[in-house]
Amino acid sequence: MFLPVFVMIALPLTAQQLYWPRDLRQAYQNQTRSNDGWPGKKYWQNTGRYDITVTALPPDRTIRGTEQITYINNSPDTLFGLVFNFIQNIHKPGVTRLGDASPDYLTDGVHVDRYTDNGTEEQWGHEDGGTLQFKRLSEPLLPHDSVRLSFEWHYEISLKSGREGMIDSTTYYLAYFYPRVAVYDDVAGWDDIEHNDALEFYNDFNNYTLQVKVPRNYLVWATGNLLNAPEVLQPKYLQRLQASGKTGQLVHIADSADLAGRQVTAQQDVNTWKFAYDDISDVALGLSDHYVWDASSVVVDASTGRRASVQAAYNDTAMDYHHMTDYEQSALTFLSGQWPGVPYPFPKMTVFQGYAGMEYPMMANDETYQNFEFSRFVAEHEISHTYFPFYMGIDETRYGFMDEGWATTFELLYNRTVMSRDSADDFYRQFRVNNWIEDNSAEEDLPIITPGDDIGGRGLGNNEYGKPSLAYLSVKDLLGDDLFRKCLHGFMERWHGKHPLPWDFFYSFNSISGKNLDWFWNAWFFSHDYIDLAVSNVQNRGGDWEVHLDNIGGFPVPVDLLVTYTDGSTVTVHRTPAIWEQDPARASIALGSKKSVRSVTLVHGIYVDADAANDTFEVK
């Protein structure tokens, strides 16, 4: 009706209202989104069922696949065609990518050998296409109807391994290996952004069955539950796998001696490993004939006692990986019980030794490092992506700060529990903050809300990692842990398995906290601000000392002051970002002491200041 729509649109039109893109405004009008942070009463999203069979026969580099897709149109729109992702085409010469490509990276891309639309074979006709391809349907796909599609395809795995590719001649990591329907959502319509090899992804939640055909003596690790372990593993190794799911002790399912004996798997010429999982955003897999296999498990839900399997697949020479299941147990315990404090939602987690430092549902593809502490740091970061984007359905392409920013935040909070706070904060400053704050070029101050596909270079990484993480940590300080946790959990409960946008996050926190935080969101996400505070004056007002601060950079950050008195004693005074709510440029802090002050210094911690020259005020 007209009046509720008018009220809904009018609500944010107050001081410091948040900018609304026109497509978001239309979604509010259509009632698929609501500015109280809830999905609208007419919210919808599309989904599919994917039945995939993929064949890899190393050292042959050709990967062959077949799939049947049932795509379900839950939208109110009639779709005359579908947009498909062919991410493997990023390896084709001439495809637009953000960065150079070595000869070992390049391939011919994906070749579609056969395609059917509702059982009728058709020419695909996109052999020269890139990572995004449109195909008109033989009949329009009506609202709340479905279409059955099938593909047969092949491609050559890249010699250079990154997020996916050949790790060695008998070890492959397969990701983004199948044709999939792109996201069609209630705000942007089709996700029509070509993959450029720098940005990440945006996927629907689908039901998957995955069959992986490999030669005997090859092990396979993949997203989902392994359905036929008795068919692919010899009894001794099956028993070890089953035992690992019931203990917190390390189980060597297959060590280097076992693998050398060539009797770990069933001895058919080709074994078919079957995996399945529903309501998940992607699948990935690793395979090898010489990677050792470790496993254990850990309780991830204290209320039910539910355990999750933790597994590691690696070359036995990778010393850090001998501790990987310990790192995984530690990470899942922290993530489930502390931050975000939501029980790990999947039945397992596998870290596979590769070259990426990349996350996938239930999988991570991580390098090996001589520094074990750094190896744990990387593993926890990738595992924390379980929640953002895989639990929450984030559009990583446009709004990467909604997943990388949270993973970076959880990474810091986790590191503070496994190393000293000073060491954890040093890690964070070194890898997440310094490169941004010490670079005063224009691209570093682009608003975080700027869609990632419109940014390149240094500005993109800092807008996705350090800057938003500092924002999340600042609002945590502003609200306090209990209210922040309530807001975070409420947002996650509202949008789990859906496609939240930044505004859904902002307005969820507003409504759950009972506070209008638009002043905070505006400064951190929509402005060109940065961190630069100054102590402008310290005054004695009738025996009561007051510190005056200027916020030159504009970001509303927490404030810590080191106050040194004339008697040599010191005290640290903390204020939350609330001091910037009424006046974002200036604030005064009453010290609450009548002792004479000698000096006041800003102590920034992780909130590194762009100009330290004005951080100390000496009282004359």
Regions found by a protein language model. Name each.
Residues A15, Y19-N35, T47-G48, F275, ...:
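Hydrophobic alpha-helical and helix-loop surface patches within well-folded domains
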Residues P21, T62, I72, D100-T170, ...:
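A surface-exposed beta-strand-loop module
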Residues G94-Y105, H154-Y208, N228-A229, I606-K620:
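Glycine/proline-rich low-complexity spacer/linker segments in large multi-domain proteins
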Residues W221-A222, V538-V603:
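Beta-strand-rich binding/interaction modules
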Residues L18-N85:
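Early extracytoplasmic/domain-onset interaction patches
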Residues D185, E200-E380, T409:
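Hydrophobic helix-coil surface modules that form long, contiguous segments used
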